[in-house]
C-alpha cells in the first residue's frame, strides 16, 4: 500500500508550509486552528493547522467489539463541538472534537457509505438500503 499525505501551502507564494503522512481517503474537516481527519485504519486525528503537528490520535474503532473492528470510517461531520462518524458496517460514532475521545456509539444496522449531514440542528444518516435515520 502507499501512504498518502496532507499538505499545507502558503497561498501568497505557493510554497509548501508543511506536509504530514496520513493514510486517509476521507475529506478532512478544517476549523480555525485544526484539521480533523480519519485514517483508513480508524484513527481520529487532529493536526495543528499552522504547524502540521499531530495534536492527538485516537483509535475510535477499538470501542467496537473485536469482530466489528474490521471496518472503515466512511464519512464524518462536525457539529456543536462533536464529530459524528459513520462506519461501513453501520455504526454511528460520536467523538469529542476537543479530546478525540469516543462519547457514544450507536448501531444503525445497514451498510453506510455516505457521510452524515446536519440540517436544522438534526443529524441525518443515509444507508445503502436508502433508509434515512434522523437524530436530534
Regions found by a protein language model. Give the residues of each.
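Structural signature of WD-repeat beta-propellers
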Residues: 1-3, 32, 39-40, 80, ...
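Short loop/turn segments that connect beta-strands within beta-propeller blades
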Residues: 10-13, 48-51, 96-100, 136
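C-terminal hydrophobic structural anchor segments
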Residues: 77-97
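Blade-level signature of beta-propeller repeat domains, shared across WD40, Kelch, NHL, RCC1
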Residues: 110-136
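WD40 beta-propeller blade core
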Residues: 7, 45, 93-94, 133
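Extracytoplasmic beta-rich repeat domains
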Residues: 1-3, 12-32, 57-79, 103-120
Amino acid at each position: 500500500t502507499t501512504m498518502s499525505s496532507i499538505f499545507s501551502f502558503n497561498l501568497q507564494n505557493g510554497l509548501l508550509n508543511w506536509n504530514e503522512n496520513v493514510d486517509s481517503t476521507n475529506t478532512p474537516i478544517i476549523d480555525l486552528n485544526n484539521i480533523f481527519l480519519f485514517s483508513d485504519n480508524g484513527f481520529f486525528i487532529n493536526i495543528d493547522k499552522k504547524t502540521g503537528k499531530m495534536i492527538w490520535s485516537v483509535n475510535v474503532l477499538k470501542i467496537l467489539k473485536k469482530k466489528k473492528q474490521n471496518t472503515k470510517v466512511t464519512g464524518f461531520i462536525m457539529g456543536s463541538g462533536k464529530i459524528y462518524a459513520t462506519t461501513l458496517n453501520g455504526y454511528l460514532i460520536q467523538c469529542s472534537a476537543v479530546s478525540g475521545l469516543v462519547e457514544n456509539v450507536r448501531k444503525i444496522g445497514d451498510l453506510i457509505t455516505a457521510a452524515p449531514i446536519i440540517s436544522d440542528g438534526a443529524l441525518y444518516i443515509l444507508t445503502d438500503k436508502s433508509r434515512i435515520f434522523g437524530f436530534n
